Amino acid sequence: MKILHICSEMYPLIKTGGLADVMGALPYAQQSAGNDVRVLIPYYPQVASKLGETVEVATVGTFAGVVTVRFAYLNGLGVYVIDAPHLFDRRLPYYDDNYQDYTDNYKRFALLGYLGAQLASGLDHWWGRSDVLHAHDWQAGLACAYLKSWNSPVKSVFTIHNIAYPGRFQAYHLAELALPWEFFHVNGLEFYGEISYLKAGLFYADRVTAVSPTYAREITEQIAGAGMHGLLQQRLAEGALRGILNGVDDTVWNPETDTNIVANYRPNYMQGKGKNKSELQRYFGLPEDKDALLFVMVTRLTEQKGADFLLARIDQIMQHNVQLVVLGSGSPDLEWALRDAQSRYPHKIGLKIGYDEALSHQIIAGGDVILVPSRFEPCGLTQLYGLKYGTLPLVRRTGGLADTVNDAHKESIENRTATGFVFSYPDADNFYDAVLRAINLWGKNKLWSSVRQNALAQDFGWAKVAQQYQELYYEIV
C-alpha cells in the first residue's frame, strides 16, 4: 500500500513536540511491514542542514508563489520537502522569538496541505498516486479539504495529536487558498466565523483518529472537545473516529542501547540506572545521594502540562528527602517561578530552561519518578519513555496517560499490574497526594523494585501501532 504522511515536523529533522517523535517512527514501522511510505514536510533550515542532498521533483506555481518540491532519503525512508524560502526559511517553525505566531501561517500550512494533496494525487510521476494520504494535526488539515474539492479518489486519514490547537484564521483568507467558497460552511471549514484547518481534517477526512482511546472519547465531550465535540460525536456515530495509542521508537528510546546516557542497563541488570542517577545529580550540582527520591520533568511549560501543580506544593515537597530536575521552556511566568524555586532550594532542584534532546534522555534514565501531571494529554510520550527506562510515571488520569499507566496501590502491587502513580482531579492537592504515595513507596525497596519491573515489562512498540493503522486504511481503500 502507498501511504503519504503530511506533517509539520519529524524527528530527527526538526522537533518541537511529540508529533515529531511519532513522525520519526510510524512511517518506518509501516515501511517495515511492507508498505511504500513517504513523508512530506516543509524545508525548514534545520531540515535542510540534516537531510543532505535532495533532488527536484517538481516546480509548481501555487497561490503561495512558485515553489519546488524536493526529495531525499532519510535512513531509507522517502521524504519530500517544500522548498519555499519566502515561507519556511525561518529559525523557528511556527512563531518568532517573541512567541508570536507568524502572520502568514495561514498560507504556509495551506501550502503544506495543498502540495500534500497534489503529491498524493500523482505530482511525482515516478512514485504515482498514493492509496492513502495521512495528515497530522491542524498544519496538515487542509490536505483533506483539497482532496475533496478535487473529487480525488485518494482516501484520507486525519490524526488529532492535540485538539487544543485548531489552526484558526480569518475567513477572508479562504479567497487566497484555491478552495471553493461553499466550503466556508458549518459543514465544512467554518468555525465561529473563521476557518479552522483542524476542522478541515475532522470534517473532510475519510477516517479520523486520536492518539489514544481515552482521548478519542474525551474529545466527543464539551469539556475536552475544544468546540469540535459536536462534529466529533457525528464522526463517531458514522464509525469514522477511533483512538490508536502512540508507540515508543525502540531505536531511539532504549536504555540497553541509548548513546545519550552514561550507562546502559536492562530489566535484569539495573546497576546502570544508579550510575545515570549519579551523573544527573553531578550535572545539575545536586548532592550525589542515592537515597533521595529524584523526581524529573521534561515538558513544555504551559498550563496544559500542570507544572503549576508542582509549583503550588514545591515547599511541602522539598521538606522530604527528594530532589527535582526540570527541563523545559514556555510560559515566562512558569519559567520565572521555577527559577525562583531553584534559587530557594539550590541543593535540591536542578533546572534547565530550554530543550536539549540528549539531556532529556539522561534525565529520564537518571530519574526515579517522571512527572506528567497534565490537565489533558492526548497521548503523552514522556510517560512511555519513563516506563521504558524504569522511571515510574506520576500522571493525571486523562487521555493517553490513563491508557498507559496503572496506579500503584495494595491490590495492583500484589497482582503485579502497578506501573506508576495516578491522580484523578486536576489540582495541586491531588497531585501532592500522589507525590506522597510515591515517597512512601520509595521507602519500601522490594515493592518499588517490583513496580519498576512491571513498568519495564510494558510493550509500546510501533509494530503493533502500525498494524492498527493498516487495518484502518483497509476500511477505506
Swiss-Prot record:
Pathway where this protein functions = Glycan biosynthesis; glycogen biosynthesis
Which SUPFAM superfamilies does its entry note? UDP-Glycosyltransferase/glycogen phosphorylase
Which residue stretches, if any, does this entry annotate as coiled coil?
A: none
Q: Which Pfam families match?
A: Glyco_transf_5, Glycos_transf_1
Question: How would you classify this enzyme at the top EC level?
Answer: transferase
Reactions listed under catalytic activity: [(1->4)-alpha-D-glucosyl](n) + ADP-alpha-D-glucose = [(1->4)-alpha-D-glucosyl](n+1) + ADP + H(+)
Any single GO molecular-function term of the entry would be:
alpha-1,4-glucan glucosyltransferase (ADP-glucose donor) activity
Q: Which UniProt keywords apply?
A: Glycogen biosynthesis, Glycosyltransferase, Transferase
EC number(s) recorded for this UniProt protein: 2.4.1.21
Please tell me whether the keyword Transmembrane helix is annotated for this protein. Answer: no
One of the GO BP terms on file? glycogen biosynthetic process
**CDD domains attached here?**
GT5_Glycogen_synthase_DULL1-like
Query: Where is ADP-alpha-D-glucose annotated to bind?
Result: K15
- GO CC annotations? cytosol
Q: Which NCBIfam families match?
A: glgA, PRK00654.1-2
Give the UniProt family note.
Belongs to the glycosyltransferase 1 family. Bacterial/plant glycogen synthase subfamily.
Q: State what this protein does.
A: Synthesizes alpha-1,4-glucan chains using ADP-glucose.
Specify the protein name: Glycogen synthase
Organism per entry? Glaesserella parasuis serovar 5 (strain SH0165) (Haemophilus parasuis)
